[in-house]
Amino acid sequence: LDELNKISEVQEIDVTCYENNQDVMELLQANLDWMQKHTAKKLVYKVRQENYILSQTENYNKTFCAEPDPRKYDIVIGNPPYIKLPKDAPEAMAMQDVCYGAPNLYFLFAAMSAFDLKENGEMVYIVPRSWTSGAYFKRFRNKFLGEMALQQIHLFESRDMVFETESVLQETMIFKAKRTNKRPEDILMTTTQN
């Protein structure tokens, strides 16, 4: 928000949140209310309490029921769930173009977020590093890197300190990518131990 407040062309900030975990809904609402009160620009928000993947299946697959002009965003920020799904899970079936075998929900979120971006829109995601190699993620990598240009990567070297209160034991990264076919000459890479 601080950066958006500095841009004179931005008159209004429109935030859409997808969250279907009732355990965090009260905290999310409090944070959105705080943001609304403490920003220099007009901020409007909407919380969609639905499945992020399944709510957009028709648009993603361009079916007969798809919206002719689905909503696209300038910025998408994501901290998706790290859950392995069965290969016949509804989310996996909805995004077969990026799935090979039993997918992890986090990369389906990333693929859907790339779909949700306007041209030159940017996304920032915190995810496991595992998507960067191996045959299991090849379809996702090919589609994602065909549509998006990585701009910055931050690696957490610790496997257990990124989410101290959770049982996530993976190498984790934050990446920033832009929806464009222009590739940057350099990608900024940084690391931290914790």
Can you say where each PLM-predicted feature lies in the sequence?
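A general structural signal for alpha-helical elements within enzymatic catalytic domains
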Residues: 5-6, 33-37, 145
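Short, flexible coil/linker elements and helix-boundary hinge sites characteristic
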Residues: 5-8, 39-42, 65-66
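Conserved beta-strand positions in the Rossmann-like core of class I SAM-dependent methyltransferases
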Residues: 16
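Short, conserved SAM-binding/catalytic segment
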Residues: 28-43
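Conserved SAM-binding strand-loop segment of SAM-dependent methyltransferases
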Residues: 40-52
